[in-house]
């Protein structure tokens, strides 16, 4: 039998006492009362903050949204299938935040900034709050630089500036995503970082967009944030804020960014689902009372920074889906009132083969010509008015049998102007090509052509300018003005090509 001496026992006890650590940690905990439909009711958590992250026993994270007198309503960031009634929940003391870094460029991530493209982890040393306050008046300056979309109809008549918020609105299947993705493709070489946020879309649609970006080399300056239709409502609600936090990171580093929210109708629906399950009182169209604030606090984060802050910018292009062209519904009117203009896409124009199907009459940019280079202002200044007059005249001409020559000429000119605004998808045009195209139409050079020949001729003209008149591009790029020299070059090229084209068509 082993005998222990008294001094050995006292040594062991002394060591144990020295090793004993009296670290007292206060943890704010609660108990699950009920769970289901992506919502949990928690008893306890007396000191939890609104919007604080809470952690369940089995690892699921949630956000405390409803702070009531006898329980806390938590929305889950996962399916929560393993959460049991009576299990414990602890407050983390943190508000939702994500890691941010340059390494996110070219990646596809979810609303929690975790990669979902199967290309490994993303290293990041900094983090940003998902929800941060919008820049104040002093830290902004007015929008003055253009953000070229590559679409003639937009860049000439509804110009978008860096730091602007321009809504893209229309029915389903009218080409809203196509306008947004073409804008991203056109930023190649423009030193603009793009963030594309897909909310509640089919995974196949998102994959198609990502494939287009990869094929056209756009992923190197783009981040895709995707929460598809099968994601929990909480993550669909958070995705736009995650995208905004990433875009803000680059904006504060004196870079230009552009962010597309595709689309905010789905985010509002996800928020409505969460709010109704949390028993918040419903308002118009069953949306909660703060659905306006949901979108305003997101879109107000887009800004053009002042010179003191480095002149970075964040341009927001939110997309909203309408039902049968009803622009006066709740979410469309909300977002229209928040943004600095809207691009309205019409199903009738789309079905008539006018693509992009932009209704120039009710589309508007509240920044206007401040977001255009001088050359574009000089050439396209009257285009919108001419097209609006043409649309009015066309409607009237349907009922009139005999029209005078001047009216017939105006109708013919209008039809050709409308024709030159048509563009194929994923085929953005450089600004000098747009200027050449509009000048050709506005000055009547297309009048001798049949409407069906316009597109073919314009392709031929742009190819000729690129190959043989490169100085035209150089003048526009360097001076940003449509000088007399540039006009003379363009006029000569157009006249020469028209004659050549008509000869080719006759033979």
Curated annotation (Swiss-Prot):
Q: Which residues bind ATP?
A: 170-177
**Site description Required for activity, residues in chain:** 363
Q: Gene3D superfamilies per the record?
A: 2.40.30.20, ATP synthase alpha/beta chain, C-terminal domain, P-loop containing nucleotide triphosphate hydrolases
Pfam families the UniProt entry points to: ATP-synt_ab, ATP-synt_ab_C, ATP-synt_ab_N
Against InterPro entries, the record matches this protein to: ATP_synth_asu-like_sf, ATP_synth_asu_C, ATP_synth_asu_C_sf, ATP_synth_F1_a_nt-bd_dom, ATP_synth_F1_asu, ATPase_a/bsu_AS, ATPase_F1/V1/A1_a/bsu_N, ATPase_F1/V1/A1_a/bsu_N_sf
Where is this protein found? Plastid, Chloroplast thylakoid membrane
Instruction: Name the keywords, alphabetized.
Output: ATP synthesis, ATP-binding, CF(1), Chloroplast, Hydrogen ion transport, Ion transport, Membrane, Nucleotide-binding, Plastid, Thylakoid, Translocase, Transport
- Identify this protein by name: ATP synthase subunit alpha, chloroplastic
Which species is the source of this protein?
Dioscorea elephantipes (Elephant's foot yam)
Q: What is the lineage of its organism?
A: Eukaryota, Viridiplantae, Streptophyta, Embryophyta, Tracheophyta
């Amino acid at each position: 039998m082993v005998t222990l001496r008294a001094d050995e026992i006292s040594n062991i006890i002394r060591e144990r006492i020295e090793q004993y650590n009296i670290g007292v940690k206060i943890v704010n905990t609660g108990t699950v009362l009920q769970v289901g439909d992506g919502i949990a009711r928690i008893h306890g958590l007396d000191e939890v903050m609104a919007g604080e992250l809470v952690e369940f026993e089995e690892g699921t994270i949630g956000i405390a949204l409803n702070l009531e007198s006898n329980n806390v309503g938590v929305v889950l960031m996962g399916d929560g299938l393993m959460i049991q009634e009576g299990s414990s929940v602890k407050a983390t003391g943190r508000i939702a935040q994500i890691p941010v870094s340059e390494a996110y460029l070219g990646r596809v991530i979810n609303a929690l900034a975790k990669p979902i493209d199967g290309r490994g982890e993303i290293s990041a040393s900094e983090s940003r709050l998902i929800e941060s306050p919008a820049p104040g008046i002093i830290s902004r300056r007015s929008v003055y630089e253009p953000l070229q979309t590559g679409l003639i109809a937009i860049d000439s008549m509804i110009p978008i500036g860096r730091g602007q918020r321009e809504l893209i609105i229309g029915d389903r299947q009218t080409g809203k995503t196509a306008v947004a993705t073409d804008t991203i493709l056109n930023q190649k070489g423009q030193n603009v970082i793009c963030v594309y946020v897909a909310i509640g879309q089919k995974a196949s649609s998102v994959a198609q967009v990502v494939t287009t970006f990869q094929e056209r080399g756009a992923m190197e300056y783009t981040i895709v944030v995707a929460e598809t239709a099968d994601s929990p409502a909480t993550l669909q609600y958070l995705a736009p804020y995650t995208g905004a936090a990433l875009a803000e990171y680059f904006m504060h580093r004196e870079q230009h960014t552009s962010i597309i929210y595709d689309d905010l109708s789905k985010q509002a629906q996800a928020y409505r689902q969460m709010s109704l399950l949390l028993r918040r009182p419903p308002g118009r169209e069953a949306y909660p009372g703060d659905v306006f604030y949901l979108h305003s606090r997101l879109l107000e984060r887009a800004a053009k920074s002042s010179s003191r802050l480095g002149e970075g910018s964040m341009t927001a292009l939110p997309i909203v889906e309408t039902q049968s062209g009803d622009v006066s519904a709740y979410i469309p009117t909300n977002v229209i009132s928040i943004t600095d203009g809207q691009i309205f896409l019409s199903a009738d124009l789309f079905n008539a083969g006018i693509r992009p199907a932009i209704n120039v009459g009710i589309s508007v940019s509240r920044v206007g010509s401040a977001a255009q280079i001088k050359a574009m202002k000089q050439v396209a200044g009257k285009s919108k008015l001419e097209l609006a007059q043409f649309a009015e005249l066309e409607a009237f001409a349907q009922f009139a049998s005999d029209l005078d020559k001047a009216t017939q000429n105006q109708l013919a000119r209008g039809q050709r102007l409308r024709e030159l605004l048509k563009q194929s998808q994923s085929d953005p045009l450089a600004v000098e090509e747009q200027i050449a195209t509009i000048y050709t139409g506005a000055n009547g050079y297309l009048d001798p052509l049949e409407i069906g020949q316009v597109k073919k001729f314009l392709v031929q003209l742009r190819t000729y300018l690129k190959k043989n008149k490169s100085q035209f591009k150089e003048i526009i790029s360097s001076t940003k003005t449509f000088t007399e020299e540039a006009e003379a070059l363009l006029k000569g090229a157009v006249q020469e090509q028209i004659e050549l084209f008509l000869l080719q068509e006759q033979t």
